[in-house]
Structure formats: structure tokens, C-alpha cells
Amino acid sequence: MAYRDQSLGELAIAIPRATKLFRELNLDFCCGGKQTLSRAAGKKDLNIDELEAQLEKLAAQPSDARDWREAPLADIIAYIIPRFHDRHREQLPELILMAKKVERVHHDKADCPHGLANQLTAIYNELSQHMMKEERILFPMIGQGMGANAAAPISVMEHEHDDAGRDVEVVKELTNGVVPPEGACNTWRALYSGINEFITDLMEHIHLENNLLFPRALRGE
């Protein structure tokens, strides 16, 4: 099957395991989910034939992941809040504490991620406000069947998702692609492992909203 003309968002929905592959290849399937596979691969100088072959293999594998394309929107919202919103509220305070410790203890090392704690704090504050607006305003509208009238708040949320994506890129720059240096202490390694987990969760979170929940809500489903 030819995947090159399909969008990253469509492929991430149709082939759940594709999100892991896209993350490994640094292909933005959440905020940049509307670009085609061919265009995204071209930007990264990836071999489109090899990429399609990898997706073919993933699509052929059985998956126990839920197919959200036909699920009631209320079910999607009920999944997003505990799986992503509550999880981010747990992840970020701990990551901020570890980042402060690493910056304090290793401030004299060349690879020290100076400014990381402040950047994570900014992400936490912005994301907390963002999720609160979704939970108090947008999600209730969608749950009450008013999604077709929610174009304005959805547009705001999508712009804030773009902002979050740019904030994550700053984190990657500060952390050498979130790769700990050789000889890094356990806290440093745990910090970067936790950041990678957070980024993976955030991308899945934004993908589910941008590419599935919001479009379906706007169609009045």
C-alpha cells in the first residue's frame, strides 16, 4: 500500500505503532500531522521507499490498541484526562526537581543543561493552564454535542499545542537531543529518561486531540 501521500496524522491513527517509528525518526505527527509522509521524509532526507516498507510491516502486526476512530467522543475525553492530563501533572514537577539538582551539582560540566529547570517550569505552567481550559471549557462543549460550535476554542488549543511543540524543541537543544553524556550520574540519566517519556506522552496526547478528537468534534459527531 502506498503511504507517501497520506498525512502523518492519518498514518498515526491508522497504524498505532507508527507513532513510535515517527518519534524515533523525529517526524512530527502531532503538531505537524497534516503534512504528507513524502513531504516529511523529504525534509529529513529519509528514504521514502524504506519508510513505506517499515510502515507496511507495522500495519501487518496485530495490535491491541483501541481504535479511537469510531469511539464516542466522550470516551476519548475520558481517556485523555487520566492518561495524559493527570500524567503530565505528575511528570513535570518531578522532572523540574531533578533538573534543578543536576544543574546545581554539575553546573561546572560542559554538558550541564543550564536553563533546563526553568524551561520545564515554563512548560508546566503553560500546560497546566492549557489543560485546565480544555477540561473546564472545551471538553464539556464537545461532551454536550456542541463541538461543531467550538471552532474558536479549538483553534486556540491547536495554537497552544504548536507552542508546546516549540517548547519541547528548546528542551531537546538544552539536552543534546535528550541524550545523557557519558558517565552521567543516576539522577542525570533518570532525568533524561523521564523527559523522553514525557515527550512521547505529550506527542501522543497532542496527536489524539489534533488529528482525531478535534476534527471529529468540528464535524458535529
UniProtKB/Swiss-Prot annotation:
It comes from the Bacteria. One of its GO terms (molecular function) is metal ion binding. Pfam families: Hemerythrin, ScdA_N. It is found in: Cytoplasm. Transmembrane segments: none annotated. GO terms for biological process: protein repair; response to nitrosative stress; response to oxidative stress. One of its GO terms (cellular component) is cytoplasm. Keywords: Cytoplasm, Iron, Metal-binding, Stress response. Homodimer. Di-iron-containing protein involved in the repair of iron-sulfur clusters damaged by oxidative and nitrosative stress conditions. Belongs to the RIC family. YtfE subfamily. This is Iron-sulfur cluster repair protein YtfE. It comes from Pectobacterium atrosepticum (strain SCRI 1043 / ATCC BAA-672) (Erwinia carotovora subsp. atroseptica). The gene is ytfE.
